[in-house]
Amino acid sequence: DNSLDFSLPSMVPIELDLDIGMGESNIDFTDLILSRIQIEGGMGEMNVEMHKPNPMVCDFLKIDTGLGSFEAEGLGNINAREVDIEVGMGSADIDYRGHFNHDVEINIEVGMGSIELILPENVNVKAKVHHNFLSSIDMDDLIKKGNYYLTDDWVSDRPTVYLDISVGLGSVDINLR
């Protein structure tokens, strides 16, 4: 049984680059000050959580899953301006609810895998989806207007989540809760 437990300082901004090949990872970012994060998972199971708002804006959050599974709770609390999510042949269940008061751009690329993304109900959403007839897209909580999917109750003074989604043979499920 190989395991590693460690803590990071909670009083200084941290830039993280995590590359985890195989195995199970449980990562709790709560109480950290995060300025930039890159997470790469190979064939393992990764669980990430953030239960309190990041006290600073995180410039960039990148999540790259290979064949493994990725689950996250409270990622909106990371307070990122730009998010890149790449899902190869694995799966990602991402709860992006949390506290953020600015617009965020989320770019999602799915190959043969699947992603379920939960966004907070109290934000505007504008999504552009690039897919083909082999892709599965579920955007039931959004309405299609022209080339975009939008929140039905758009309010100009609340944050907007801009989604740019590309799907190959995989599936994408976007929900508002």
Explain the meaning of each model-derived region:
Residues 1, 48-177:
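Short, surface-exposed interaction patches in beta-rich subdomains
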Residues 17-56:
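Right-handed parallel beta-helix
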Residues 1-13, 17-26:
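Membrane-embedded segments
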